[in-house]
Amino acid sequence: MQCSLVEVSVSVDWPRLQKALTVEVERGFQNLQGKQHRFGDFLCLSFGSPPPPGSSPGDRQKWREFAQRFAQYDQLEEAERKSLVASTRRFLHQLRRSLESPPRDSVPKKDLLAQVNRPQVSEPRYPKSGQIELHTPLATVVSQSQHQTKLLKNLGLATVEDLLFYFPRDYLDYAQQVTIAELTAGETVTIVGRVVNCTCFTSPKNQNLNILQIQLRDQTGRIKLSRFYAGKRFAHRGWQEKIKKLYPPQAVVAASGLVKSSKFGLTLDNPEIEVLDRHSPSIDSFKVGRVLPVYPLTEGITADFLRKLVLACQTAIAKLSDPLPQEIREKYELIDLQTAIAQIHFPENTEKLSLARRRLVFDEFFYLQLGFLQRRYEQKQQQQSAIFTPHGELLEKFSDLLPFRLTQAQQRVVNEILQDLNKPSPMNRLVQGDVGSGKTVVGVFAILAALQGGYQAALMAPTEVLAEQHYQKLVSWFNLLYLPVELLTGSTKTAKRREIHAQLSTGQLPLLVGTHALIQETVNFQRLGLVVIDEQHRFGVQQRAKLLAKGNAPHVLSMTATPIPRTLALTLHGDLEVSQIDELPPGRQPIHTSVITAKERPQMYELIRREVAQGRQVYIIFPAIEESEKLDIKAAVEEHKYLTEKIFPNFNIGLLHGRLKSAEKEAALTAFREKQTEIIVSTTVIEVGVDVPNATVMVIENAERFGLSQLHQLRGRVGRGSHQSYCLLVTNSKSNDARQRLGVMEQSQDGFFIAEMDLRLRGPGEFLGTKQSGLPDFALASLVEDQEVLLLAREAAETMMVEDPNLEAHPDLKIKLVQRYEKLLGGEILT
């Protein structure tokens, strides 16, 4: 789902939002189904867009919080829904009124920024080591052991500047304390009291669960707090005694958390507990009465020690230079860097913390986007590619022979590609298209432009199944154009392989489709002008680079059927031009999608029998090919045997999984395509590329094991013909999170909406797969919460590249860009 700032600025439909809220109230908070989305999802998406321009930082924060709260709407009890809807209506009313007619006594934005320009920071009470500079070693600032110095270096903290840019991961708001007597269930609070007693023990009911219990008292009463530690290592007696010693009798403790009611009275839900002062007879402490930072720690470095160190380094903040140009700071209402660093560590209040965080998040995004754009600019300056005309006989013939008209979205993307190919700098464009949107035909226009210019093209796919699918489709088109095309995979026979190599090197073969086999040293093109990479995220950087090296700065077109939200695309592929095919060909029927449990299997089997009896075909998908007791995942191999012998003995059932030999895979797919088998049991090998219009049922077992985007890809294997299709998501999971995610699939067929919800519900790491996600190493920025800031930073970076592409007028920014860009990417090039 694409969302630009221009669109957002005019798309906050206040009456529609209020009407949705009113109807939800009138219908008893049932999470009503609208034309496209359920009420909760509609509100989640509405608040997921950037806040209206002119909103205060506080209102921006509340706007983002509402997005997160409505993401959980389906799980809320009626009373909780009622409370959320009421608070939302109040917030929207107040926000709209403040935007349309700001109160006279409100502080103007610029005045508010001016107020935090020089924050008052408490002076450290620790000995100073002379004049503190940014390059001063931390070992000379505060007294510390050699072991502590080593531990700090392990955290990447060697100098004062390192520490100033080591940001807190959270905050404890000791400024807003309540007494024990004032506790109210449902509120998040902080209490301060003295330890009466402390125990740590292993639960008698669960040997893997260990419980820390602390009884606190203040002048108004007593409370018992519990923290839980899961894992056998916490059951060790030595560890338990060590933890108890942290909370000796009379130690002053601050505890922060959600107040909940239990059978023993009020308590805090698994609270954050902070020892303030173990020896002082009073509760006076430099920590109480302010918002305290909580830093990522390592064993041997305490929170107290790190805070003292940060306080001692505060005087060096004045030495920081701000490389961000003043005109950018003014345009985007950003506070200066010195203020932001001071307030991020020891904020005076939440408003100033919000301003500080916004500035530093902007910096992270700005340096990343500027780095991407600079890299693209330098590549274009250094490389010269062939220029392909956007017109010609081949392109016209292909347009005429197509049995359908391109959608408006397809035509728009084709035009963007042909414009790129008509320039001397190499194209580097990513085409995103929803399932069935017609990416392949768009790619063919690019291929034909290269061929009619006298160059060769290569199309690389991640699997043999997908490569074969592309090859078959291209052959059907290229035969009509009298153009040869060949397929090269790991299964290609030696004789055929040699023939292909010879034809490539002489230029006789204009187009080669294949898998990783294309990057072998023996594959040599005479004149490679275009590389098309399908499902490009499946290939590593080195694999893509090897293929590009087979030509002289060839144009590159990447394609993916896995929609990526715009913020994620900017973060991963900021140096690419991104096109979206956000329209499906006419005539596609919505796929009827249902989440079912094991109890409903008889009805599912009956649906399959009915569809097969009408001549249709069925996919049954499993997440693994071996039985796994740990995850309780049904194996495709075992289930194939069970279905064949017990459930559908009269049907022909095929089997497809990743461990079959290539010939066996192709045989299974061919049998399914040619209707020799009515049902195919498969793992996710079937996920992309397989096109069987006669298939109308997709059954996905253990659906909770898949990401939403992957489920959407699998569902896209049906619904390709004129008959009604069905997708059945089978799960036995009792998890509310799993049920909520699968509910999104029932409600929407829009891949971009599903990708956006997947990102919100699972976060970018889970969305991409944490092992090779390629995500930049952000210290503060969140791709879910900070989408608005990312878009502003991209806009600022694009403006900078237009006005000063070599940064000659901004030398400080140029130096800082190299440091920050490399740090964000971990020294690696992503694309």
Swiss-Prot record:
EC number(s) given by UniProt: 5.6.2.4
Top-level taxon: Bacteria
Any one Gene Ontology BP term: DNA recombination
Keyword Nucleus: no
Domain Helicase ATP-binding: 420-581
Positions annotated to bind ATP: G433, D434, V435, G436, S437, G438, K439, T440
InterPro entries to which the protein is assigned, alphabetical: ATP-dep_DNA_helicase_RecG, DEAD/DEAH_box_helicase_dom, Helicase_ATP-bd, Helicase_C-like, NA-bd_OB-fold, P-loop_NTPase, RecG/Mfd, RecG_dom3_C
Reactions catalysed: Couples ATP hydrolysis with the unwinding of duplex DNA by translocating in the 3'-5' direction; ATP + H2O = ADP + phosphate + H(+)
SMART domains attached to this UniProt entry: DEXDc, HELICc
SUPFAM superfamilies on file: Nucleic acid-binding proteins (SSF50249), P-loop containing nucleoside triphosphate hydrolases (SSF52540)
Molecular function as annotated in GO: ATP binding; ATP hydrolysis activity; DNA binding; DNA helicase activity
Sequence ranges assigned to domain Helicase C-terminal in this UniProt record: 600-765
Motif DEAH box location, chain numbering: 534-537
This protein's UniProt keywords: ATP-binding, DNA damage, DNA recombination, DNA repair, DNA-binding, Helicase, Hydrolase, Isomerase, Nucleotide-binding
Region spans: Wedge domain: 175-289
Quaternary structure note: Monomer.
Family that this chain belongs to: Belongs to the helicase family. RecG subfamily.
Domain notes: The wedge domain within the N-terminus inserts into the replication fork junction, where the lagging and leading strand split.
The protein's role, per its UniProt record: Plays a critical role in recombination and DNA repair. Helps process Holliday junction intermediates to mature products by catalyzing branch migration. Has replication fork regression activity, unwinds stalled or blocked replication forks to make a HJ that can be resolved. Has a DNA unwinding activity characteristic of a DNA helicase with 3'-5' polarity.
Protein name: ATP-dependent DNA helicase RecG
Organism: Synechocystis sp. (strain ATCC 27184 / PCC 6803 / Kazusa)
Underlying gene: recG
